[in-house]
């Protein structure tokens, strides 16, 4: 019975549902709109690695811009200044940036990346949804060694504050989680 509970919890975590959410009584959903997300955001986060012995935790600086597109979608650009390589006492700073344009999908409040990609050839498949848990952007790719990689960025807002939760699962194993807070600098 315990094994079954662990397996169910893991499967729910893989699709982004906590066991508390399944067991909790329904609460009225806070109405959020994509308009609330449009703008420039900046903040910090802490990354926790399940696989990196030299950097089990590390700090990151985050910049995020979300702008409305003229076709009912949006453009999201984020940059992360990571400190998780080199000497743990003096880590190297590595800037990683990503920009993805999303267009409406068939289901309301869902979007898919405008660019058509093939995850079998190293392309990253992106999709997004807006629901009671916030703006969730997910990605999937197949690494060069054939192992699947699934990433989820969950962004929740309250006024000018944003909470970020990120998870990276490779070949069924949690590699890294990131939690952070951002402030809205300006609306777009």
Locate predicted features:
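Positively charged n-region of N-terminal signal peptides that target proteins for export
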Residues: 1-5
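Bacterial N-terminal signal peptides
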Residues: 6-17
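Sec/Tat signal peptide C-region and signal peptidase I cleavage site
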Residues: 19-23
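Edge beta-strand at a domain terminus
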Residues: 24-26, 149-188
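N-terminal helix-cap/turn-to-beta initiation motif at the start of protein domains
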Residues: 25-42
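One face of beta-strands
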Residues: 39-45, 60-62, 162-164, 178
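Central antiparallel beta-sheet cores of small beta-barrel/beta-sandwich binding domains
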Residues: 45-143, 148-150, 185-188
